[in-house]
A protein has these predicted regions:
Chain A
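Transmembrane alpha-helices and adjacent helix-loop boundaries
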Residues: 1-356
Length: 356, 296, 254
């Protein structure tokens, strides 16, 4: 437990050191991409626990990200003042709908970001619950194709629906006031604060997942990955556990979708594309599959490089190549904790070999 | 909806359905010899179409198609030799991820060679407005080319597997790899061959439909998922049923356009895939008992 | 007193009647063995009892309640643990962690509680680890606690799997060929271990091929052949039963 606290503290120090470095070198604008990387990292962490630990592949996680992001964007930009009626005024009185000025000095009546966020995450969770049951009964290729299919459905729907802006997506999404004085917003004056807010969310998520991994639930998930029938025989309700971790994982993606959408001030269909889902999976793979820290560091580095445009027009190709190389040559991942465990295990076995 | 319009939808459905059937057959060939679902199957179709379009500028059409098919076949062989052949006991998860990676790689290479533009081969006979009247239905001659060539391919393939030594060796590998190896069949070569066959057939499919459906660097993924839907619908590994299931999906999709906006066309077929996977993963024609015995 | 009662259980696979109308009782506190030549339906019977397969017909009453039709994990929760013919240890987990999974039923922290690491989950985790170490002590594997389970010797892996089932604190323990693949010394050791488990007040039902093991430790033996029960008696009587001798020796299956 103390080791975990140290790891978290160490990571927080790294986050602070990066901010300091950008400040000292006069590259403060890099914080924008680093903030975005943080939100993508939330998706990656959620996928890591699902695919790496519980062994359930998903090639549709961008779908959950998009459900969260799009719904929050839609609710906070759709002008309800034209609708009138008692329901609208009632919601306005409860503070769920709030008035705010638009770009041209007019007045908009839109859903306040908090209820919008809650609704959006709730919707993603509901979808995950609904499809998770039948989807997670599938294994191997079938599971991969079904999750891929889910991702494609979400992508096609957002791309084909005028209400959510079709190919243009939704823009002019307002800032998200989390607490008085703290808002998720892309304004350059709030850049440093948002950097810390975003990584704060990641650290919080990391603490939750690390606790989970080390608990009885974490062991149950790993046992489902290792030998599902034996896990059943130990009294673990495997179907329910798979569904629950799928929902947790979808919730991480949806929260990330909501927050990044408010940070960017908009969302487009490319956020729900298959390529995004594959990208998350590639990061989990290179991070070492069942390795939260590996996934987190790889997500930080690769997303940052990608968002800064270092991969140029080879952006997607880079992730494709990474995926292939990892799977061909190091399918247990590059940053493997198991490697250390193996060395330690070997030493212990040698020591224990003297026993009769 | 009057009868003529109805038939018109059916014809459109058959055209698209044929290509889905061809992609599904590609899935089946590789699945049968290896137990792998090749997620890059749609990319073979795209590659065939794109290569033929480029070659058609300098070569006569039949030669361009032939060379495109050969090129794609070689790509299929290379993929197997470079990425699949030397893996020992790869897990299903690993194979899925590798073929997904390959699919992305092929697509990105295509993007850098050909750009984002949408291309098409010229119509084999006549132009896009030429049509033959059959009863009350106007049919583009290209539709006849698509259906005709596909039927010939399926027939040749059937004959190949049934009557030639090589085909029988491939079937032996599919039935029992170890036993086939004991009989002196090189299972590894059979796997390479299955990748070549499935790449070649996919490429040919890509060539013949490109005048109607067009082709661009990213047309592989939707084709792959629909081809997979069809392969599942027909029962994985069952090529004859795939052809029929392809028609079924094509026609369903074609009619869906009359009910829902065309932008949601893909949603329909993917939704069908999900429903089938949830309800009857052994396919419409397969037995549930057999599906459970397959290694997943 | 009967703890587990199997009544008229049948299961068919295609054209093969794998288990045909089998009935017998497992008395509380005893070691009952099911023997029979290869393909007699022993493992299928195990799968039927533990819920991994559904029978076509029949009834299984465990501790006075019908358990047929329940999911395997529900049956486990009622106090039945099992091992597998081919060891099914969890890879990438240590020996101790494998055992700890067996404590799942005796802890209750849910997803949210575990994520938040609430005080009660902390206490629970300590208790789980203590119980796990006690099991390792019992198995004599304390020294290997932190080794990766699947890297142990085969005999030790079988012990870990047994320990994992034991960690469930079952009322009845189903062992599917516990001596399969073990050498003579390991088999004898396994026999002693099973006897010691019975002393912990655990009823044992085992399927076994190794006659020496079965004859040494069982109180009651059920003989299956082609899915049917052909004999049920104490070991000394089974050894003299002409029908049993015929199927074991006459057909050369043993």
């Amino acid at each position: 437990m103390r080791k975990q606290g140290l790891q978290i503290a160490g990571f927080a120090a790294v986050v602070a050191a990066i901010q300091l470095a950008t400040f000292l070198t006069g590259n403060v604008y890099h914080l924008t991409q680093l903030t975005m990387s943080a939100y993508y990292s939330l998706v990656v962490l959620g996928l890591c626990i699902l695919t790496g630990y519980a062994g359930q592949i998903s090639i549709g996680h961008a779908g959950f990200f998009a459900i969260g992001g799009y719904l929050s964007a839609l609710l906070t930009t759709h002008n309800f003042s034209a609708h009138g009626g008692r329901v609208v005024s009632g919601l306005a009185a409860m503070g769920i709908l709030a008035r705010r000025p638009d770009l041209y000095g007019g007045e908009l009546l839109t859903v306040h970001p908090w209820p919008a966020c809650i609704l959006a995450v709730f919707a993603a969770v509901a979808v995950a619950y609904a499809i998770g049951g039948p989807v997670l009964k599938l294994k191997g290729h079938y599971l991969a194709m079904a999750t891929l299919g889910f991702g494609i459905i979400v992508y096609r729907i957002v791309l084909g629906t005028e209400l959510v802006g079709a190919a243009d997506g939704i823009y002019d999404v307002p800032a998200f006031p989390l607490l008085p004085g703290i808002a998720v917003s892309g304004k350059s004056s709030l850049r440093v604060m948002n950097y810390y807010v975003a990584w704060g969310f990641v650290i919080l998520g990391m603490v939750f997942l690390m606790n989970l991994v080390r608990s009885r639930v974490g062991r149950a998930l790993a046992s489902i990955h290792g030998a599902e029938d034996a896990a059943e025989a130990m009294g673990i309700p495997t179907a329910r556990y798979k569904l629950k971790i799928f929902v947790v994982s979808a919730a991480f993606a949806a929260v990330a979708g909501v927050l990044l959408t408010h940070y960017n001030g908009g969302i487009g269909p490319s956020e729900s594309s298959v390529m995004k889902s594959v990208r998350y999976l590639a990061i989990v793979a290179i991070g070492g599959m069942a390795n939260l820290w590996g996934a987190l560091f790889m997500s930080l580095i690769l997303n940052y490089l990608s968002l800064r445009g270092y991969f140029g027009s080879f952006d997607d190709a880079v992730f494709g190549v990474i995926l292939i190389l990892i799977m061909l040559f190091a399918h247990e991942g590059l940053l493997r904790r198991q490697l250390l465990d193996q060395i330690r295990g070997a030493v212990i076995r040698r020591g224990g070999g003297d026993d009769p | 909806m009057n009868l003529d319009l109805f038939l018109q939808y059916v014809v459109a459905g058959i055209t698209y359905g044929t290509i889905y059937g061809i992609v599904a057959i590609g899935f089946n060939i590789i699945y049968n010899t290896t137990g792998i679902i090749n997620f890059a199957q749609g990319e073979f179709v795209m590659l065939g179409g794109m290569t033929a379009v480029t070659l058609a500028r300098v070569l006569p059409l039949p030669a361009a198609i032939l060379v495109a098919v050969l090129v794609t076949t070689v790509v299929g062989a290379l993929i197997e030799i470079l990425f699949i052949r030397w893996l020992r006991h790869p897990s299903v998860l690993r194979m899925i991820v590798i073929t997904i990676g390959l699919s992305i790689l092929i697509r990105e290479v295509a993007l850098h060679i050909w750009g984002e533009g949408v291309r098409a081969l010229p119509y084999f006979t006549g132009t896009s407005v030429t049509s033959i009247r059959l009863g009350g239905v106007y049919i583009s001659p290209q539709v006849l080319w698509v259906v005709g060539i596909s039927a010939v391919v399926v027939a040749i393939l059937g004959g190949f597997f049934r009557y030639t030594l090589l085909g029988m060796q491939m079937r032996a590998c599919a039935a029992n790899r170890d036993a086939a190896r004991l009989c002196g069949i090189s299972a590894k070569n059979m796997v390479t061959l299955s990748f070549m066959l499935s790449a070649g057939i996919g490429a040919l499919g890509g060539c013949i439909v490109s005048p109607i459906t067009y082709v661009s660097y990213d047309s592989g993924v939707p084709l792959a998922i629909k081809g997979f839907t069809v392969a599942i619908l027909g029962g994985l590994g069952n090529s004859a049923a795939s052809a029929g299931a392809g028609m079924l999906l094509g026609i369903l999709e074609s009619f869906s356009v009359s009910v829902l906006p065309a932008a949601y066309k893909d949603v329909i077929s993917v939704a069908i895939l999900l429903v089938i996977l949830f309800v009857r993963p052994s396919g419409l024609f397969g037995s549930a008992e057999v599906a459970r015995l397959k290694e997943f | 007193m009967t703890l587990l009662s199997i009544r008229d259980v049948s299961r068919r696979f295609g054209g093969i009647q794998a288990v045909d109308n089998v009935s017998f009782d497992v008395p509380h506190g005893a070691i009952t063995a099911v023997i029979g030549p290869n393909g007699a339906g022993k493992t299928t019977l195990f799968h039927l009892i533990s819920g991994f397969l559904r029978p076509d017909r029949g009834s299984v009453v465990f501790g006075g309640a019908e358990i047929l039709g329940l999911m395997p994990h529900q049956i486990a929760a009622k106090g039945m643990a099992r091992t597998f013919q081919q060891t099914r240890l969890f890879p990438k987990m240590t020996v101790l962690e494998n055992i700890l999974v067996g404590r799942h039923l005796h802890s209750r922290g849910g997803f949210v509680a575990c994520m938040l690491h609430l005080p009660f989950t902390r206490r629970e985790e300590r208790a789980v680890r203590e119980a796990g170490r006690e099991i390792l002590e019992f198995l004599g594997l304390s020294g290997q606690a932190d080794a990766e389970a699947v890297r142990l010797s085969y005999g030790q892996q079988r012990m870990v799997e047994l320990g994992r089932a034991l960690a469930c604190e079952p009322r009845v323990l189903l062992l599917d060929e516990p001596a399969a693949g073990l050498n003579m010394r390991e088999t004898a050791e396994m026999g002693r271990l099973i006897s010691r488990i019975r002393e912990r007040n655990v009823t044992i039902l085992l399927v076994e091929h190794d006659m020496s093991l079965v004859m040494d430790i069982s109180d009651e033996i059920v003989v299956l052949s082609y899915g049917q029960k052909i004999a049920e008696d104490v070991p000394s009587a089974i050894q003299r039963d002409p029908e049993v001798i015929r199927i074991y020796l006459g057909e050369g299956d043993a």
